[in-house]
């Protein structure tokens, strides 16, 4: 079973306007994006709004942060499952991505509620592509891997196919920075 690839999560203030364009309410907007590898390299996402009143409760009662994070992780799993169903694709294993999202959002909500600054987290992912296996490239075409390789997914920067050795060199450069 393949995995859904988590790309990005963000938390920030979002103003809701009435039909005349006047500010009506201020909410916290949570945005989550991912890539359903089984379908293609198409990015998917959803937004979740939290009222300012509930945000105040979350500040006073930290256990509400965990409740909200669990709720958003369930929304993510549900949205991804519905998408797979629509495309008649094998369901993704969401457990790893949900756990990663939970960890990121717990940190994010604490940071956002303490500092009142927008929080954004990019999840870089690595997919192993064994020699001979087929993969779908960004152009939507299917290709066969000519050697053991990996696809490194950088949120916002696209995807990059590379060999294990190239990946190790890239990681060493990043670790030195």
Predicted regions and their residues:
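Negatively charged, low-complexity tracts enriched in Asp/Glu with abundant Ser/Thr
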Residues: 1-15
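Short A/G/S/P-biased low-complexity tracts
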Residues: 164-172
């Amino acid at each position: 079973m393949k995995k859904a690839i988590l790309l990005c999560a963000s938390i920030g203030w979002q103003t809701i306007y009435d039909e005349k364009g006047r500010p009506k309410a201020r909410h916290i907007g949570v945005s989550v994006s991912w890539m359903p590898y089984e379908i293609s390299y198409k990015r998917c996402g959803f937004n979740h709004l939290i009222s300012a009143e509930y945000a105040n409760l979350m500040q006073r009662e930290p256990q509400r942060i965990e409740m909200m994070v669990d709720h958003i992780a369930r929304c993510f799993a549900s949205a991804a499952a519905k998408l797979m169903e629509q495309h008649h694709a094998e369901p993704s294993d969401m457990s790893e991505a949900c756990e990663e999202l939970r960890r990121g959002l717990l940190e994010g909500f604490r940071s956002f509620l303490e500092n009142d600054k927008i929080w954004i987290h990019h999840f870089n992912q690595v997919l192993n592509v064994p020699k001979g296996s087929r993969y779908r490239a960004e152009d939507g075409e299917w290709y066969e891997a000519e050697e053991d390789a990996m696809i490194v997914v950088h949120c916002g920067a696209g995807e990059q196919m590379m060999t294990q050795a190239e990946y190790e060199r890239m990681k060493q450069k990043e670790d030195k920075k």
